[in-house]
């Protein structure tokens, strides 16, 4: 092969490589654009479906919108973290009655749903969903920091230690073995623990933007100091 032929061959190889690289970069950019488009779509939809006024002061707007989408369109957090089916929806807004859906803002994520004695009938504690709204500090879920909130979703730890493991016969306040009283029961944290940090942060940001619900008087675990 002559030097001229070698040069032409090398040039052809370089051109093919350049085309391949350009194609790869274009594919990556398209994927990034598609993902950004999906993210923006979720953010917009999140604001559209938020059932309560949002306080965006000092908040990351994009995270609040994404958090609303996750909480209201994917996770159905209010389905458990409201006082129950009877008060989850506003009058005339129960979709199960064939009515246009309207969430009750007075109970939205304020907790209070009683799942009954756990693990079943007997002298066992009632599992009641927690109040997820922010308190007077502006921090959601009883004033927990983001790191604490993330730890709850990742590990299921019950930072309030409401129902410890029984050290003797069940008395209605403790959980019988083999249930671990350090962990939240019923809450599907084993599923939530697989969420990305970005999504968990978005949920936290959204919960910090919703109105505070005071709930029943202290010392109820559902009580929030709103002012």
Give the location of each predicted region.
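Ser/Thr/Pro/Gly-rich low-complexity linker/stalk segments immediately outside membranes or between
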Residues: 28-41
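Electrostatic cytochrome c docking/interface patches
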Residues: 42-72
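Sequence/structural segment immediately N-terminal to covalent heme-attachment motifs in c-type
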Residues: 60-100
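Surface-exposed intrinsically disordered loops and tails
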Residues: 45, 87-122, 161-178, 222-226
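Hydrophobic membrane-insertion alpha-helices, especially the h-region
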Residues: 11-24
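N-terminal Sec-pathway targeting helices
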Residues: 2-14
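Sec-exported extracytoplasmic/periplasmic mature domains
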Residues: 69-76, 82, 154-158, 205-212
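Electron-transfer interface patches adjacent to heme c in soluble/periplasmic c-type cytochromes
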Residues: 75, 96-152, 160-161, 189-200
């Amino acid at each position: 092969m002559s030097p001229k032929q070698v040069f032409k061959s090398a040039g052809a190889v370089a051109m093919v490589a350049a085309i391949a690289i350009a194609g790869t970069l274009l594919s990556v950019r398209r994927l990034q654009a598609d993902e950004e488009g999906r993210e923006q779509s979720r953010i917009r939809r999140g604001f559209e479906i938020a059932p309560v006024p949002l306080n965006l002061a000092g908040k990351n707007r994009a995270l609040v919108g994404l958090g609303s989408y996750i909480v209201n369109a994917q996770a159905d957090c209010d389905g458990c973290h409201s006082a129950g089916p009877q008060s989850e929806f506003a009058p005339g807004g129960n979709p199960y009655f064939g009515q246009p859906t309207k969430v009750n803002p007075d109970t939205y994520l304020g907790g209070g749903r009683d799942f009954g004695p756990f693990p079943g009938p007997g002298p066992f504690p009632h599992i009641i969903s927690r109040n997820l709204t922010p308190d007077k500090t502006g921090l959601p879920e009883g004033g927990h920091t983001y790191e604490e909130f993330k730890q709850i979703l990742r590990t299921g730890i019950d930072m309030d230690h409401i129902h410890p493991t029984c050290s003797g016969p069940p008395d209605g306040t403790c959980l019988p073995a083999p249930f671990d009283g350090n962990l939240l029961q019923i809450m599907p944290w084993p599923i939530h623990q697989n969420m990305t940090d970005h999504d968990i942060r978005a949920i936290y940001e959204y919960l910090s933007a919703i109105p505070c619900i005071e709930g029943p008087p202290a010392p109820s675990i559902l009580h929030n100091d709103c002012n």
